Amino acid sequence: MSETIYALASAAGRAGIAVWRLSGEGSGTALSALTGKPLPEPRRARRVRLRDGAGEVLDDGLVLWFPAPHSFTGEDVAELHLHGGRAVAAALTARLGELGLRPAEPGEFSRRAFLNGKLDLTRAEAIADLVDAETAAQRRQALRQLDGGLAGLVEGWRSALVRAMAHLEAVIDFADEDIPDTLLEQSVGEVRSLRREMEVHLDERRNGERLRDGIHITILGAPNAGKSSLLNRLAGREAAIVSAQAGTTRDVIEVHLDLGGWPVIVADTAGLRDSACEIESEGVRRAADRAAKADLRLCVFDGTLYPNLDAATLEMIDDATLVVLNKRDLMTGETPASINGRPVLTLSAKAGEGVDDLVAELARVVESRFAMGSAPVLTRERHRVAVAEAVAALSRFDPGLGIEMAAEDLRLAARSLGRITGRVDVEEILDVIFHEFCIGK
């Protein structure tokens, strides 16, 4: 008999309603003890008064009963919809402890759902992603994964490998029988096609992971080009210190933004220049490091200096760069249409002019570079590692070198894919996955 657990499934703190969840074989007994009544009709809310061991009323609320296996965890589950006060929470947890229930660990409800076959690992991860989603794009991706898109893709690959394994095993075990000569050729063709499909997903520039974790945009430029002022405009607050003194920014300053539904992390960096100051030089080194790792770069120039622009910043311009001429309110003369082959946007970070145009262009570029449509994508590093291992095994697949070895390569590939959904022994990764969860999930 597994332990019966409980947790607050809604947000902690003072609230109009608090939802408590119980799961395990003792849930029904605990619910009856709290209400002093028989269990309610399954999946129908009942208003009751909950009482402590001495019969004193704890609260007046709604209770629901979900008998196994028709529940989220696959176990007997009870939900208590009570008032969200601290006194109610303290009295309830004390009573649940008296009844032999223990507090749930983070992710324990979802872990039990997985172990009882209610969720595969990708859907369990999708629940965590949906809870953590801060933008519309993150929400949509989590819902697609929760709907089984990624699980269906991976299981389709795995099923195809199992069929190919069966064909090879037939050739091995029934060599004396009348096995069609085309069976082996068919399997080789299917395996090669599968490998190419997996490689396509590995080549997607980690877009699913970027969407989960945030798309990194780094602001680069010479000292006093207006990088910090631009960051503050984008953030809508004073995130960075703005000063007429060159070299004020010496460390990387990050702000998290919702850019048209896309999660982005914009980083302001130290001005690109040689400096005798050890601290400032370290800031410049970090700026170059962030630029190399960024998904997009904003190269900001002091427009009043055009055409004598900073050489170090010009060297940073590539296809993943937006070029910005700042201080357009002070500029004279014609504005160039492009610099180093990249279109130019002009703005005044100090006055706020042109910033909306930059935001719109950033959103357009992000959408064009990272949009994934409705197709399932790999959303975690562990997914990518597993698919890469499968591709490596399939790259070795060659029945001409021995059918037994070829069958083993297929088994290794199928096992790697099985780790994504949990179709193999994955006890070693469960703790890592479910540790990311909220307590009541």
From Swiss-Prot:
EC class name: hydrolase
E.C. number(s) listed in UniProt: 3.6.-.-
Binding, Mg(2+): S228, T249
Residues annotated as domain TrmE-type G: 214-367
Binding site for GTP: 224-229, 243-249, 268-271
GO cellular component, one term: cytoplasm
Gene Ontology MF terms: GTP binding; GTPase activity; metal ion binding
Cofactor binding, note field: Binds 1 potassium ion per subunit.
One GO term of the biological process aspect: tRNA wobble uridine modification
CDD domains attached to this UniProt entry: trmE (cd04164), TrmE_N (cd14858)
Required cofactor(s): K(+)
Residues annotated to bind (6S)-5-formyl-5,6,7,8-tetrahydrofolate: R21, E79, K118, K441
Mitochondrion recorded as keyword: no
Cross-referenced Gene3D superfamilies: P-loop containing nucleotide triphosphate hydrolases, Probable tRNA modification gtpase trme, domain 1, tRNA modification GTPase MnmE domain 2
Main location (coarse class): cytoplasm
Keywords: Cytoplasm, GTP-binding, Hydrolase, Magnesium, Metal-binding, Nucleotide-binding, Potassium, tRNA processing
HAMAP family reported in the protein's UniProt record: GTPase_MnmE
Subunit structure: Homodimer. Heterotetramer of two MnmE and two MnmG subunits.
Family (UniProt): Belongs to the TRAFAC class TrmE-Era-EngA-EngB-Septin-like GTPase superfamily. TrmE GTPase family.
Job description of the protein: Exhibits a very high intrinsic GTPase hydrolysis rate. Involved in the addition of a carboxymethylaminomethyl (cmnm) group at the wobble position (U34) of certain tRNAs, forming tRNA-cmnm(5)s(2)U34.
Name of the protein in question: tRNA modification GTPase MnmE
Protein species of origin: Paramagnetospirillum magneticum (strain ATCC 700264 / AMB-1) (Magnetospirillum magneticum)
